[in-house]
Amino acid sequence: MKVRKLKNAEINLIEEELSKYTDKDFVKSFKYENLIVLEGKWLTVCYTNIETIKKLNMFQDIFSVGNVFGEIKRKFRLSLEGFTLISPNIINNYAIVNEKAEALFLYGRDIFKESIIEVKGFGRIAVFNKNREFLGIGLFDGKIIKNIKDKGWYLREGG
């Protein structure tokens, strides 16, 4: 895949997504210079260190580098690892669930409202356990958190 730096329009898409979950200060101070783009069927945004980015021109075809932070199709969507990276700073669009729901969610199951300790926001949300450890991504409709992808996915699917 071809590797390149982010374009300004792509940075704007990432800022827009980050602002759904974090505050303005985090969005402004985020290290966008640590992000690069892998061009394939769609644009994969990877987070890595500056030293690695400087050495990427030594390689012709790169399959992966650093952590996949998200993907750009029409919009930017944070990946599981992207959410993990920003999780200490998430203040909007999240849910905290009880222990039983945590276990079920990590097995790919959905979460019912009675298992939710705290929720802020609707739609695509970050899901945490009661210790505020990031578990995965869900879709909250006011009654159920539908599991989109969780940390247990790596073990179940061999990702």
From Swiss-Prot:
What is an example of a GO molecular function annotated in this UniProt entry?
Answer: RNA binding
Q: Which InterPro entries match?
A: NIP7_N (IPR040598), PUA_sf (IPR036974), UPF0113_PUA (IPR005155)
Transmembrane regions: none
**Domain of life assignment:** Archaea
The family this protein is said to belong to? Belongs to the UPF0113 family.
The name this protein carries in UniProt is UPF0113 protein MJ1410
The species this protein was found in = Methanocaldococcus jannaschii (strain ATCC 43067 / DSM 2661 / JAL-1 / JCM 10045 / NBRC 100440) (Methanococcus jannaschii)
